[in-house]
């Protein structure tokens, strides 16, 4: 079967979950609401592509006329939220607002994982650029050299982690930028999670 774009996979995952939960497929308007888009024209195009690629069949004139093919369930996927913005540069508040959902292979993640969108160029030498989606596994500890999402005085930043005797160092991967030094009792800082993958859209 042909590969799917991230948006097509999100639609397919939502349809599959809806069928599993309710016993019948969603309408195009329900899919549009899930994608947080106005109108159903884009949804119709995604459904046409999924049908053309063999993942489902459509019944014209039926608002719920979507039938999943048997091959659809061979690779379990999970739909993860994209939340807020992490600024890879000067820390910026990460608003916990879900922008969209992206489906990936379920075997790649554990419960609670999410995507954060990267902004800035402080991690370019780690091949992380503006617009990338950082796949974050929630955890409160890290090892030296882990790339983490950390909160500093209520602001989020994505950096490489180093533990010192009385401080932590959040190191950018850009020689033109200085590290962030967080000393015990001076600033409030904690780790949100470890970056375990980077996803970049090519479309």
Swiss-Prot record:
Catalytic activity: Hydrolysis of Ala-|-Gly bond in repressor LexA
Keywords (A to Z) from UniProt: Autocatalytic cleavage, DNA damage, DNA repair, DNA replication, DNA-binding, Hydrolase, Repressor, SOS response, Transcription, Transcription regulation
One cellular-component annotation, GO: protein-DNA complex
GO biological process, one term: proteolysis
Hydrolase is among the record's keywords: yes
GO molecular function, one term: DNA-binding transcription repressor activity
Active-site residues (renumbered): 122 (for autocatalytic cleavage activity), 159 (for autocatalytic cleavage activity)
InterPro entries xrefs: LexA, LexA-like, LexA/Signal_pep-like_sf, LexA_DNA-bd_dom, LexA_repressor, Peptidase_S24_LexA, Peptidase_S24_S26A/B/C, WH-like_DNA-bd_sf
Residues carrying the site annotation Cleavage: 88-89
EC number(s) per entry: 3.4.21.88
Disulfide bonds: none
ATP-binding recorded as keyword: no
SUPFAM superfamilies, A to Z: LexA/Signal peptidase, Winged helix' DNA-binding domain
Subunit structure and binding partners: Homodimer.
Assigned protein family: Belongs to the peptidase S24 family.
Job description of the protein: Represses a number of genes involved in the response to DNA damage (SOS response), including recA and lexA. In the presence of single-stranded DNA, RecA interacts with LexA causing an autocatalytic cleavage which disrupts the DNA-binding part of LexA, leading to derepression of the SOS regulon and eventually DNA repair.
Entry-linked HAMAP family: LexA
Name of the protein in question: LexA repressor 2
